[in-house]
A protein has these predicted regions:
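Conserved MFS/SLC helix-loop-helix module at the cytosolic interface between two early adjacent transmembrane helices
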Residues: 60-98
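Extracytoplasmic
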Residues: 10-44, 61, 65, 151, ...
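Helix-to-loop junctions at the C-terminal end of transmembrane segments
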Residues: 61-73, 279-290, 377
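A late C-terminal transmembrane helix in Major Facilitator Superfamily
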Residues: 331, 345-380
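Extracytoplasmic gate region of multi-pass secondary transporters
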Residues: 29-36, 222-280
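C-terminal transmembrane helical hairpin of 12-TM major facilitator-type secondary transporters
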Residues: 290-341
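Cytoplasmic helix-loop-helix junction between adjacent transmembrane helices
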Residues: 106-141, 347
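Helix-loop-helix hairpin linking two adjacent transmembrane segments in secondary transporters
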Residues: 139-190
Length: 416
């Protein structure tokens, strides 16, 4: 692979810590939505305009994310993400006006667009090559584990200090972690274009041959290779309804049916721990059972979790609240699906490009769910809104299975 084991491990640790500190901030904010609503004195629909702005920006920038990653490299994208995440955390903690809340979410949109999982996939692919799936799964799992610990600590700290002070401390920590990990642990990461130019001087012909040796297709080629990529992008759009729906609305769902806000925050911490262990094994599970079976497990698991939450809301049987949120954690694979599934469905020839397209599809869905689901809640109530999430999971599963069944890589492997 061209890198020592120590260098690969160091890079993976750096990526993990940056992801946990930068993208984890969004998870922490989701866990304290009831506190933020009280602090800003706004209703849920108005509050969700902020995250909607963030996801609109995320979608718009994800569409050009691969270009940005190519120009300034995945490592620097992640450093930008750390800085923006810190600013977001500080502004959310001190926001008492709706304008500050919107500005904070604009910054968060930049973070989510290209500075988290899309950039992380680019870094991991450089260091791990054909083992990218396993490495990415471990990185995602460890990231989720760290975020879960962070959320658990947050739920405890909220008892002894106001969230405004807590978020200021978090903002400083995110910058420190981001700078250290990007500059020291991850170190130098070659740009993709520079890497191609660095092919042996026997030159363009040898470089082209090396490119052709990579199995798979470019994003442009997949658009002409049948319906698989379209099914895949639709599935990524729909899965955002499930993933963003549960993480953004679970805490207010719980409190709307009588649960204390601090207990609701602890439940999201439990979700994060469950997600962490699932993500940790994701690459190995995918290699063992394949994309088709894994898709079924992800979406049926989530749907079963929603059913448990629905029953809990009517019976107040606390174990169902716990089982439900744990099963819902299967949907936490959502943002990792492009990084995990792309090699099997479309190969490694344009891993970063197709990965970025999948992330863009996800944020296109997230644009609609944050504001759309709040409207559904306003008209139908929390119970029926969560029924919609369960249905969305089953529809998403159908599209993802169609993407797997029509994958162009199946034909390529058949020819071999």
């Amino acid at each position: 692979m061209g890198y020592s084991k120590g260098k690969r491990v160091s890079a993976a640790v750096g990526v993990t810590l940056v992801l946990a500190s930068a993208s984890g901030g969004t998870s922490v904010m989701n866990a304290i939505v009831p506190f933020l609503l009280e602090g800003m004195q706004v209703n849920l629909t108005t509050f969700m305009i902020g995250p909607t702005v963030a996801t609109i920006l995320s979608f718009a920038m994800s569409a050009i994310g691969v270009k940005i990653i190519d120009i300034i490299s995945p490592k620097w994208c992640m450093l930008i993400g750390s800085v923006c995440s810190a600013l977001t955390m500080y502004m959310v903690g001190t926001a008492t006006s709706f304008v500050f809340w919107i500005i904070a979410n604009v910054l968060n949109g930049i973070v989510l667009a290209f500075a988290t999982y899309a950039a992380a996939g680019g870094v991991i692919a450089v260091f791990y090559g054909e083992n990218t799936q396993k490495a990415f799964g471990v990185v995602g799992g460890m990231t989720a584990l760290l975020v879960a610990a962070w959320m658990a600590a947050t739920s405890g700290l909220l008892h002894i200090m106001p969230y405004s002070q807590l978020f200021t401390v978090y903002a400083v920590g995110i910058v420190v972690v981001g700078v250290f990990c990007n500059l020291v642990l991850t170190g130098k990461v070659p740009r993709r274009k520079a890497t191609l130019k660095a092919q042996p001087a026997a030159g363009a012909e040898q470089g082209d041959a090396a490119s052709q040796d990579l199995p798979g297709y470019t994003f442009g080629e997949t658009l002409k290779k049948g319906a698989s990529i379209y099914f895949f992008l639709i599935a990524m759009f729909l899965v955002a309804w499930c993933a963003s729906g549960i993480t953004s609305y679970a805490s207010v769902y719980y409190t709307s049916f009588g649960m204390a806000a601090t207990t609701a925050a602890a439940m999201l911490s439990l979700y994060s721990f469950a997600a962490a262990f699932l993500k940790l094994a994701s690459g190995f599970i995918l290699k063992r059972i394949g994309a088709k079976a894994m898709s079924i497990v992800i979406y049926l698991g989530f749907a079963a979790g929603i059913v448990c939450l629905l029953v809990w809301s009517q019976t107040q049987l606390f174990p169902l609240a716990i089982v439900g949120i744990v099963l819902c954690a299967f949907i936490s694979y959502a943002t990792m699906i492009p990084g995990l599934f792309v090699p099997d469905l479309y190969g490694m020839k344009d891993y970063t490009g197709i990965n970025s397209a999948g992330v863009a599809g996800y944020y296109a869905g997230a644009v609609t769910v944050l504001f759309g689901l709040s409207i559904v809640i306003g008209f139908l109530g929390y119970f029926n809104a969560f029924v919609v999430l369960a249905i969305a999971a089953l529809v998403t599963m159908a599209f993802m299975l169609a993407a797997v069944a029509t994958s162009p890589m199946r034909g390529m492997k058949g020819k071999e």
